[in-house]
Amino acid sequence: MKLKHLIYGVPLAVLLITAGSSCRKAQFNINRNINQPTDSSVTYDVVLPAALHATGTIIANQWGPIQNWMSYWARSGTYAPNVIEETYQITTGFGNGIWNSCYDNNYDYQIVASKAAQAGAGFYEGIARIMKAHNFQVLVDVYGNVPYTQALKGSANPTPAYDNGLAIYQALLREIDAGIALIKAAVVTTTNANKNIATNDIMFGGNKTLWAKFGNTLKLRLLIHAYAVGVINKTTEIGIINTEGSGYLGVGENAQVQPGYKADKPNPFYNTYIANTAGTQTANNVYYRANDWGINYYAWDGDPREARFYVAGSGGLIGVPYGLPPITANASPVLAGIGPGVAKTNASPQAILTSAESFFLQAEARHRGWITSGPSAATLLNTGIQESFTYLGAGSAAGYLAFNASYPDVDYAGVAQGPGGPVGGLFTILSQKWFALNAVNTLEVWTDWRRVPYSEVATKVLYNNSNAPTTNFVYGDGGAYTGTTGAPGPGPFRSVSPQITTADNIPVRYLYPQTEYNYNTANVAGQGTITRYSKVFWDLN
């Protein structure tokens, strides 16, 4: 891993929250090499709130290309094509912000964890350990094998070895357990090492139960990702969660950071995709417009969330095909843009993991028989749908559920709409995750697209990671299997770039950054030949 300079973060009172997509942090009168992650001039209570904000910035700002690939957004005709992205011919220079941001952020959490451990501040240490696990999950899901065991060692090991993705996942499960235990055991007073946790914990305000629920939900996400990997015993792991006893994030329990965002220190998603601190429209707001397949799918289902994910342009709620040349595509003002449900205000909290996603994860675990008591998979699914509506400000989901009764992309008991079409169950859960996580947590949607094998959903191919665009069936189609006029076809739709070849399809991973090949040469070379179609360990398609 290339050794870089880290600028440590400070609380919002003196924190300059920037709009940069690599979540660099404000200056704290030091600019030290990350080989010194325990510098005496910073303290764990100072670093924690800035680190949590930085995690929110990662979730907010790093996923534009995947928003496009998953058919939510597309480039407007106002801009020239991004040929590398729109033909899927990504390079070692593509998307490096995810790698850099996650490792930078984890150096901060390492500072918190190590210094808090020395001080006996178990609450702070526990939070840092859970959040490090969150970021390593992101890294594995994007890159596969990554430095883990030898990472964050500073000058003791400037060229860390890579760990197997499965081994990292197994370690993360135990790391989260340790974090939960530390938090639950922590004694908080106004004078001891855990003081001010209610203020410095900008996600849950020092609420032990919510941190335990978040940790358990994060563990469930890991288990769902690796559902087909037998080495991880799902029954055992669910048993550990049940024994801990806090459960998962529930109704209204969104994991989101709020350090005090406001006009001059805005929410990172709003500041990147809507307007800057002066209130001026950002370039990203002009660039990213509605994808026509995605927006039409919401419309086909009569989904009120359409007007929350998108805001009408001068042409109404219309989109543009991904990869369409500028000479053909509509200019940005004509097309629908990023809507008020995800870009609420500059003062809104930034979501890390929503209650809607928590219920979708629980629904899949119930569907697979891992969770054996409590609400049914259908009830958990419908609760997740309502939580999505609530988060987006879309009101009640009751009318939407009634309108789409028996349709398998909405109704867990839905029936096939044509010969060979999908039925309810897992298809419904995954379809609803696609509907709900638009610009909320796009990585999870890309992960679902990659992880589910063809045999999982009735007789119809739901996910296809092959490079054959003619069989690129992915999510639900709202009835198009019957050939209904106006119904959206299967998707996400492949790019329509005229420069694409028949060998090009949506990548199943990012490539390691070029800096790894430059500075950690032997270890990255040990991973073999990596292409955009080299699979993450849980991708068994």
Specify the residue positions occupied by each region the protein language model found.
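Hydrophobic helical h-region of N-terminal Sec-dependent signal peptides
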Residues: P11-I17
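Membrane-proximal, proline-rich intrinsically disordered regions
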Residues: C23-Y72, N100, K115-Q118, P469-F473, ...
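Active-site/pore-lining binding-face segments in mid-to-C-terminal subdomains
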Residues: L381-G478
